[in-house]
Every structure is written in C-alpha cells, then in structure tokens.
Amino acid sequence: MVLEVGMGGALDSTNVIDMPEVAVITNIGLEHTEFLGNTLEEIAMTKGGIIKKGCDVVCYNSAPEVVSIIRQLSAVWDAKFHLVDFDSVTPVSHDLSGETFEWSGLTCNVPLLGDYQLHNAATALTAISALRDRGWAIPDDAVVTGLSKTRWPARFEVLGREPLFLLDGGHNPQCAEVVAENLTKYLGDEKLVFLTGVLSDKDYKAMIASVLPHAEQFLCVTPDSPRALDALDLRDYLRGLGCSADAYEDIPSAVHAALLTGKPVLAFGSLYMAGDVRSSYYKEKKTAQRKYCMNSRRMLTPEQRIEFSAELSKNLTKLPEVQNATHIFSYMAMQDEVDLSVFHDWAEQNGKVLSYPISMQNGHMEAYTLGEEPVWNYGKYGIREPNPDFSELRAPEDFDVILVPCVGFDEDGGRIGHGAGYYDRYIDRAPDACRVCIAFEAQKLEKVVEEDTDMPMDYVVTEAKVYTF
C-alpha cells in the first residue's frame, strides 16, 4: 500500500502507520505556511514526522537545510537515509510525449513533461531500490511498465495536439516559472493563447510576469472558488500591461474560443478550473470528431455499405474469440452503421447464441436473446430491439464477445460512440468479455480524444483490416 500525505506529515491523518517500509520526502517549498511553519526548516520538521524507527528514508535532493533536517531525523529514529541522486537517471530524449531516460541498465519512459519529472522519477526509483533491499521482489519489467503508465493530470498535461492544448494547474509563482521553462524547452519561441483564471489571494501578478513572454493573447475566466479573481478584473489588469485580453462568462465558452483560434493553447492559473477545462475540451473535440466521422460514413454509397459490411462480417468470423464463443452480444444497425446481417447468418448457422440490446430509461441497456419466433420493437432511437416479453434477459457475465458499434476509432483502440455512454457502462459490467469495435475504415481517426470513462477495445474490425490491441 502507498499512502500519500495530505499536508505536512506529523499531524496528517495518514500518519497512523506504526512501521512503514519506506518514508519518502519529496521536494519541499514554502506552501501552507500558516499550518506548517514559515521556514523550510520548520516545514521539513513537520514533513519528517512520517519517519518511524527502523524504516528507510528517501529524501529528495532539495535545499541543504531541508536535507540536513531529514538526515538528522533519520539518525534519531535509526532509519536508513537515502539522498536521491539525480544523476542516477540519464536523459535520452524528450518531446511532447514525455521523457525517456536510462536507469540501472533500463531504458524507461514517463509520459510526463518537464525536467523535474526526471527528478521525481529518480525519487521513485530510489524508493524502489530501498524496497528491493528490504526483500521486496520488484522485477525490472514492472518498473518500466509502471513508469510508462504514470499519469499526473493538470501538470503540463497534453490534452490534444491539433491544435496543441496544454493544461497546467500551477497556482503560484514557482509553478509559473516551471511552466515558462517547459514552454521554452518544448516550444521554443512559439507564442500561445493563454486560457487563464486565478485566485485573488495568490501572487497572480508574479505568475503572469513569468509566462508573459510566451503569450500572444489571454482568455480570462473566473475559477469555481469564492476566492477567485473575477475574469473582468483579470482582463483589465492584463490590458493595463498592454496585453490582448478578453473575459468570458464561463469556461466552456473560453475553451470554444481558444480552439477557434487554431493556435497552441495553455490553460493555466488554478486547479479550481482544471476539471471544467478538461471536460469542456473533451466535449468540444469529441463533438468535432463525431461530426467528421459521421460525415465520412455518410459519404459511402449504399452499394459500398453493403459490400463493406459483408467483407467486415467475414473478417469478424475469423477472430478466434468469435469462433470459440457461445454467447455473442451483437446489435442491429442504425442509420449508416455497419450492417451485420451476414455475420448474424453465419453465427446462427454455427450455433452461436446472439443477443441484442434494449436501451433502458435509466441510461443503461440490457441484452436479450430472441425467442424461437423473434418479436421486435422499435426503440426510442428508431433501432430494432427485442421485445422483452418474448425474449430472454442475459446477464453481462454471460457474454464471451461484445460487438460494439462506433462513430469513430483510431489504431490504438480508441473509440467514439454516439455520446450517451450506453456501451461503456455495459462493458464495465462484463469485464471478461472480448470487446470488438465494428466500423468502416472511413471512420478511422488519427487519434481519438479519450476520457477516463471510455472503455478500451480488444479489436477493431473493418472491411479492410483487423486491428489488435
């Protein structure tokens, strides 16, 4: 178990562990001074309260006075002290996908941006080494995989690339300086549109000063906090500096305006706006991608749809999971979707049990197997659905394979549906089923805008190819 301290250490609610294996002290700055103390030494003493007798202590190599305090506390508690050696990780390359480095003969990648992420990685790896010394079996492949799957939302996070859209929740001058350094490192002299909101009790003037050389214009919003600086006041301050600045009534409007510029965007200034920025961005981009894919599908002629649907059905029958399946969750096509009639004929001839969805009023759907004499209804979306009075309800765990229609997909297994989330919610109830996305090749995108609630696919089957993940 890994416990992250909320604030400080000695008096934090997480500090109830009698004998931790490793206590990790990360970088310490002058934050929460009203609770933790006004100097680095005072804060270090509070942070060091998580050190217990006989544990290992991993200390981020920060200010000398901090390191000295943590070293002394480790000695008091007879705890083995490890000072993180930042040179233990050797940078190899960096781009907007993350940082690649070498450590102890391994080539590792973290999908996080900024030089300080290498320092954070070195800290984590030092903790791993300490655990190994204490007898923990942590294989190299687990280290490499764990680093590659690390996520840190709203820390110079790339939400999208067309145009580039960055999100950073930094809310103090120190964070702003790091943001400015990262902009120089990754984008050079390129100017950005800043979507900015700040809290009135933060030193926002110093924050603005750090990023000003990188700004082409500012779109000002009011974060969701009683301490927020009103967007109009922020706009007026920026205009007083000679900046191009406009105020927006809400965050969705500002995100929409930022994307319309077609220029790189950085949403920045407060964690209180990060969640709204993320959701608004995904909604905007998914709407655009959904429209593009539906238009692409609509451009197919009726003859092409029939031909491609038949070819796709043949590809589908070749999947081992489909050939070995007993229960298959399928669907009836709507509008211009892939028609699986050819596949349904094959499935029935080969003894497969087919079930079809019914959309329920509560935002969920259920699957029903038709009776010997099929009786259909037309659902609220105009799709043919089994009549539940003449069909058998199937539990999600019954299914070996679930066929999932889509609006768009990418080569990494990303999928865009119609936006209601019916399939994502159902798939979550059937964790052992093979998930197969069904689409025409014309519906392929370079990269789907994904959200945390989007369920990954095992295959995407088109008339031209089977994509495996």
Describe these PLM feature segments.
Residues 368-469:
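Conserved phosphate- and dinucleotide-binding cores of soluble alpha/beta proteins
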Residues 1-4, 20, 25-104, 121, ...:
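Acidic, Mg2+-coordinating active-site environments of NTP-dependent enzymes
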Residues 194, 202-204, 285-397:
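N-terminal active-site beta-alpha-beta segment that forms phosphate/nucleotide-binding
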Residues 56-61, 194-196, 216-224, 352-358, ...:
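Short internal beta-strands
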